């Protein structure tokens, strides 16, 4: 494949846009560099770049596009609303209707507020938890990404009793001192952190199913024990479901797993491809948010009519019968096909799949912890990524990211992807 126009546009982009991209994950730095492909349009499961190349897309904008690009029902809803106005600065009936559908699907969302991104949603749940508990510190799990606000860009200390350190320039050490990071799926480390810090801990921030170092399930009993230990300590449980809400079934991962948090942050999928974030939870906690309570959160674009209309249309597609069964079937076909090819070519790799999402790790052990992904073979992934890209398969340019299937992928798309993987693996020997 030729990428002449992408390379030209990337050089031009570097003149005007810092680093040539508006989010660092879009660069190819993690796969050895080079100009990222510049896309022109998307339809269904496919993307088309400025050089005219066609791709089967498993990036899906890092997760939001579960119904594929330019889904007719969602596109029609957006166009119709745009003709009526995109922003009023007043309450709308659309906000009410969307909130109602979300609470019907996720019962723990007793009260809901909308924001504009997952970062805002998580940031605000932490503020609300602090207001409710009158405590300051939070616990999070290593490897989970919760947005780019200061409080969650904190690296782990040397153990559960140790405070974190800034994971980005510009994050004050004083902020990092409010965060304790422990390993996911390690309940004893979590218990040790709670026992040490006790009433300092306002909340624990959890991805109930991890989506930020690939797709990783909680070990049996882990989430239940986190809930018990937390509540015994007066600590709130916040679920970051920005990736997982409506990913695996019509609802949130918490309902699939049978574990209920106190607060939930959501985003990505529920916006139907438009910017969105939201949070909600127990009414007695949510009532601490302005205008009813002292915890302030506001936003000019929050609950804007365009995103609300797109979100409603998105849920109307996902609530149809058989949607998630199809995603699971396609995911299984892709997983089983990749595994056969791994065995055929004697590739050191393992697969984690959860319904219609999966991650291919270049390591010889089943992945349950962040350190395993960190230590996996990044060079092998980079080689695989480029070999797949050159055959028209678009993956996330990072060994930490997942592959996402959509309602628009077909068995033929899976088979074509497996043909590409067969070739890629043959070149990696």
Swiss-Prot record:
Keywords: Cytoplasm, Isomerase, Porphyrin biosynthesis, Pyridoxal phosphate. The keyword Nucleotide-binding does not apply. The modification N6-(pyridoxal phosphate)lysine is found at residue 268. GO terms for molecular function: glutamate-1-semialdehyde 2,1-aminomutase activity; pyridoxal phosphate binding; transaminase activity. One of its GO terms (cellular component) is cytoplasm. GO terms for biological process: protoporphyrinogen IX biosynthetic process. Pathway: Porphyrin-containing compound metabolism; protoporphyrin-IX biosynthesis; 5-aminolevulinate from L-glutamyl-tRNA(Glu): step 2/2. Belongs to the class-III pyridoxal-phosphate-dependent aminotransferase family. HemL subfamily. Homodimer. This is Glutamate-1-semialdehyde 2,1-aminomutase 2. It comes from Staphylococcus epidermidis (strain ATCC 35984 / DSM 28319 / BCRC 17069 / CCUG 31568 / BM 3577 / RP62A). The gene is hemL2.
């Amino acid at each position: 494949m030729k990428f002449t126009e992408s390379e030209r546009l990337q050089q031009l982009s570097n003149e005007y846009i810092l680093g040539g991209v508006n989010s660092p994950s879009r660069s190819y730095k993690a796969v050895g560099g080079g100009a990222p492909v510049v896309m022109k349009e998307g339809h269904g499961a496919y993307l088309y770049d400025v050089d005219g190349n066609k791709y089967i897309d498993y990036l899906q904008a890092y997760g939001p596009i579960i119904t594929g690009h330019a889904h007719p029902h969602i596109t029609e809803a957006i166009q119709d609303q745009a003709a009526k106005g995109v922003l009023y600065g007043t309450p709308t009936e659309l906000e009410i209707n969307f909130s109602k559908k979300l609470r019907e699907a996720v019962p723990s969302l007793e009260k809901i507020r909308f924001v504009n991104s997952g970062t805002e949603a998580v940031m605000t749940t932490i503020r609300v938890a602090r207001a409710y508990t009158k405590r300051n510190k939070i616990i999070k799990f290593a490897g989970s990404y919760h947005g780019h606000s200061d409080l969650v860009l904190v690296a782990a200390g040397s153990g559960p009793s140790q405070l974190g350190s800034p994971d980005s320039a510009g994050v004050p050490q004083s902020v990092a001192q409010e965060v304790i990071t422990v390993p996911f799926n390690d309940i004893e480390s979590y218990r040790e952190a709670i026992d040490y810090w006790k009433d300092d801990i306002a909340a624990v921030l959890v991805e109930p199913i991890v989506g930020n170092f690939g797709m990783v399930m909680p070990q049996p009993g882990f989430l239940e024990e986190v809930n018990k230990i937390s509540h015994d300590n007066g600590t709130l449980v916040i679920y970051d479901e920005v990736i997982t809400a409506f990913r695996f079934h019509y609802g949130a991962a918490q309902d699939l797993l049978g574990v209920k948090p106190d607060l939930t942050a959501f985003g990505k999928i529920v916006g139907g491809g438009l910017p969105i974030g939201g949070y909600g939870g127990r009414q007695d906690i949510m009532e601490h948010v302005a205008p009813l309570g002292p915890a302030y959160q506001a936003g000019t674009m929050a609950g804007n009519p365009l995103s609300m209309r797109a979100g409603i249309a998105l849920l109307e597609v996902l609530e149809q019968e058989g949607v998630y069964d199809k995603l699971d079937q396609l995911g299984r076909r892709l997983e089983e096909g990749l595994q056969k090819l791994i065995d055929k070519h004697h590739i050191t790799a393992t697969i984690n799949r959860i319904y219609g999402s999966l991650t291919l790790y270049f390591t010889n052990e089943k992945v349950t912890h962040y350190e395993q992904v960190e230590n996996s073979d990044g060079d092998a992934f980079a080689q695989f990524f480029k070999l797949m890209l050159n055959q028209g398969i678009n993956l996330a340019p990072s060994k930490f990211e997942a592959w996402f299937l959509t309602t628009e992928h077909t068995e033929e798309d899976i088979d074509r992807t497996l043909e590409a993987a067969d070739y890629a693996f043959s070149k990696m020997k």
